[in-house]
Amino acid sequence: MGVAVDVETTGTAVHFGAIIELAIRPFRFDADGIITDIGPIYSWTEDPGHPLTPETVAITGLTDDDVAGRRIDEVEATRLLRSASCVVAHHSVFDRPYVERRLQGARGLDWACSFSQVDWRSRGFDGRNLGYLLQQAGYFFRPHRAAADVDALVQLLRHRADDGTTVLAELLGRMRAPSWMVYADGASFDAKDVLKARGYRWDPDRRAWWTEIADDARTAEEFWLATTVYAAGCGARAMAPRFEMVTAADRFL
């Protein structure tokens, strides 16, 4: 069984924001990644302990009256999450830290991300925004409410490519495969453009450019970094990049 998850929050930074809406919808799927049954929606709002900002109200559609005195059912939400073999969100790098901070009993589960782990272009889609993907698939929904986003996600997971494979099947394959987080520690300032062009992003906390690559791409990435970023004359302040293996249990954190 899998669960589709979405959160609405008071901010983009997990250390400064709080969940104000959590939605979970369980679903069953077969060995081919075809969804065979969709369960009921579970949705909670939660009072963050302070008034919502106008920006939060505009983005989420939630008001102070919607969340006043409300709490997430921690026991039920944790039970649902732990009952699943995979937790799917459309932007797991955002949703997972919020969920695990709020529901500590749901830490260490296998997560997948339909935003970053699906090759949407090869499936004939432009862009990766949830609403835009759904429109291209022929559906319309009200964005920025957790329950609506979860339902939209489930519909996308059911979508089939020309060869019959579902989005969920592709996602599960990517989720189960180990990958590497690559940190270009000590890269010179002048290397930022080539790193960015290769898909690296800046992590202000680690103060390093990083990317995630498939397990079988490590050798090629090591060679590229050695010749482009860490070669003599490139100005790197470290001898080599850092590679950390990640799996579905610790990815997106």
Model-identified regions with their sequence ranges:
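Residue-level "edge-of-site" marker
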Residues: R70, A147, A208
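Conserved non-catalytic scaffold segment of RNase H-like nuclease domains
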Residues: M1-L109, R123-P143, C234-R237, E244
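HAD-like small-molecule phosphatases
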Residues: T78-R79, S85, R96-E100, Q117-W120, ...
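Short, acidic/small-residue loops that bind anionic groups at enzyme active sites
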Residues: G108-V118
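Acidic, divalent-metal-coordinating active-site segment for phosphoryl/phosphodiester hydrolysis
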Residues: A148-L156
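Acidic two-metal-ion nuclease catalytic site recognized across multiple nuclease folds
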Residues: H159-L253
